[in-house]
């Protein structure tokens, strides 16, 4: 879905408003703790941790909170939770496939909150494997466009396993296999190009076109899911035309 605005990405990101700011902070802090536990507490040797800290700073999370989360994760301070990654699958209104990624210390609470949000907003949970076959885990690395051309970026990452370079407005998005994320990052740094972000994402192989009303229903469901502290990301297979995007942006 290259070239579309954030509304049309397979992963719907909620807007940062005051009502949801606290929840967003909590999720960013959790990600830092988990990244430090998984790959060590040194950001210079742990790209995932480095990315998570940058995201938190960009969202104006206080430095003290960031540092405490890093120390909890690395074991320098006590108090870290036993986080579990859980992926729920299901369908939203109009047959839209949904993957709901949770990071939780309470499996029962996460399941209850996800099920409640789905049921109240026209969705239903499915069995494991019911929709995940429609999605592929993809590595995504982004860089600020600045003075760079698409060819500049492509030449830097071509030998590092990059599959595509897409123009997404102010950013270039590079897709690759998840196992090649580090190689792509290293190639960009070697070429003097600063990495904005990198993550493992889910991209749909089959997309469902929606009109504006259908899109609004999905976004309402996604917002309800992301109201749960346990829900980290929601991936869908929606496809929105430029006309629908224009209508949504005028809401």
Curated annotation (Swiss-Prot):
Q: Which Gene Ontology BP terms does the record give?
A: regulation of DNA-templated transcription
Gene Ontology terms for molecular function: DNA binding
Q: Which UniProt keywords apply?
A: Cytoplasm, DNA-binding, Transcription, Transcription regulation
Which pairs of positions does the record mark as disulfide bonds?
none
Region Disordered, as annotated, extends over: 1-22
Q: Which domain of life is it from?
A: Bacteria
Q: Please state the protein's primary subcellular location.
A: cytoplasm
Q: Which PANTHER family match?
A: TRANSCRIPTIONAL REGULATORY PROTEIN YEBC-RELATED, TRANSLATIONAL ACTIVATOR OF CYTOCHROME C OXIDASE 1
Q: What is this protein called?
A: Probable transcriptional regulatory protein cgR_1708
